Swiss-Prot record:
Keywords: DNA damage, DNA recombination, DNA repair
UniProt key word Acyltransferase: no
Family: Belongs to the RecO family.
Species of origin: Serratia proteamaculans (strain 568)
Keyword ATP-binding attributed: no
Listed SUPFAM superfamilies: ArfGap/RecO-like zinc finger (SSF57863), Nucleic acid-binding proteins (SSF50249)
InterPro entries xrefs: ARFGAP/RecO, DNA_rep/recomb_RecO_N, NA-bd_OB-fold, RecO, RecO_C
A GO biological process held by the record: double-strand break repair
Gene3D superfamilies found in the cross-reference section: Nucleic acid-binding proteins, Recombination protein O, C-terminal domain
Protein name: DNA repair protein RecO
Stored Pfam families: RecO_C, RecO_N
NCBIfam families: reco
Length: 243
């Protein structure tokens, strides 16, 4: 690749004695795997910038699944995530590493990701709000298009006071059954608008995104969720829910 491209490090691990294997999310090529040769050596000027949550400009080259990082520059300082916000960011990074195909264009999702990180860093909204909004954006970009505002059975607009049961690949159908797969019309409107004004709608959003993302994760648990739980256990006033 000849030009520079905006990117973030999703995950990095040591490779050989002095190199790094990087999973990166780029604006134009989606998720790419890059080998940063010599990045761990004492003389490398890449050490400080190849960190999660640092906006980068990168260039790479080569063939095959793993490309070679040619250059990388930090556009600005890393976004200041700490505490719950840091673990929320790690969750988002792991989610992208797990569900995105390599070298597929997710240019709009890149901006959703940036917006999520900026919201977490600024603490403009609760981490739960930011995560649910991003998960719904991610599902939309993965082609998981659902109509939250109409009953899949009748085609009628959802009623705030009625209950609808989620059926995979079909949508939401009016039902008298109230269980894990059931949502009120009010909760469905919140999902459609990606705005969650209270604990009830936030929990409903979490329930739905967990169900919808499960097939993409292949039954393998996310490590970041366990790290978050360990962090929460140490807090004097733990939050209502985990990531």
């Amino acid at each position: 690749m000849d030009g520079w491209e905006r990117a973030f490090v999703l995950h990095g691990r040591p490779y050989s004695e002095t190199s790094l294997m990087l999973d990166m999310f780029t604006e134009g090529h989606g998720r790419v795997r890059l080998l940063a040769k010599g990045a761990r050596s004492r003389r490398s000027n890449l050490k400080g910038c190849l960190q999660p949550f640092t906006p980068l400009l990168v260039r790479w080259g080569g063939r095959g699944e793993v490309k070679t990082l040619r250059s990388a520059e930090a556009v600005s300082l890393g976004l200041p995530l700490s505490g719950m916000m840091l673990y929320s960011g790690l969750y988002v990074n792991e989610l992208l590493s797990r569900v995105l195909e390599q070298e597929a264009n997710y240019s709009v999702l890149f901006f959703d990701y940036l917006q999520c990180l900026q919201a977490l860093a600024a603490e403009d909204v609760s981490p739960e709000q930011a995560l649910r909004q991003f998960e719904l954006a991610l599902l939309n970009h993965l082609g998981y298009g659902l109509d939250f505002l109409h009953c899949a059975g009748s085609g009628l607009p959802v009623d705030d006071g009625m209950t609808y049961r989620y059926r995979e690949e079909k949508g939401f159908i009016a039902s008298l059954v109230v269980d894990h797969y059931s949502f009120t019309g009010r909760e469905l409107r919140a999902l459609a608008e990606r705005q969650f004004p209270d604990v009830q709608t936030l929990r409903a959003a979490k329930r739905f995104t967990r169900m919808a993302l499960k097939p993409y994760l292949g039954g393998k648990p996310l490590k970041s969720r366990e790290l978050f739980r360990q962090f929460v256990r140490k807090q004097p006033d733990p939050p209502v829910d985990d990531a």
